[in-house]
Amino acid sequence: MLWFWIAYIIVTLIGILHTIFNIYVLHMKPMDKESMGEGYEKTKPWHPLYNIVIFTVFGFIYMNGLSNPTIAEAFITGAIWVSICIVFDVFGWVIIKHPWSLTFKQFYVEYQPWITLIYIAIFIGPILGFLLTLI
């Protein structure tokens, strides 16, 4: 679980820093009462990429630490990681209100296809990590 949480925190921080960069360096519009703002919206296509890279790296670290990793363990790990992420996201980004929280519609409808691609990336991260252990 340690590797999952480290990856999750890193991906979240990268997304936040990317948004801040867009707002302050590229002078994109920040969030307002109507939307999350241009600075955030322009980061969305990058979110699956952050996730596939980071979760593959941490999937590799996790799988490489096992005495005899198998592809079945990689699939199980991917399923566990994406399940935890889905549940945590509901609380962390929708239910618990904060300046960057979203509504259910914003997170699960308007964030398409990105959220689906993110969850696929998290699922396959340990699988790709396992494949890297074979090299």
Task: Label every PLM stretch briefly.
Residues 1-80, 84-135:
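Juxtamembrane/disordered regions of integral membrane proteins
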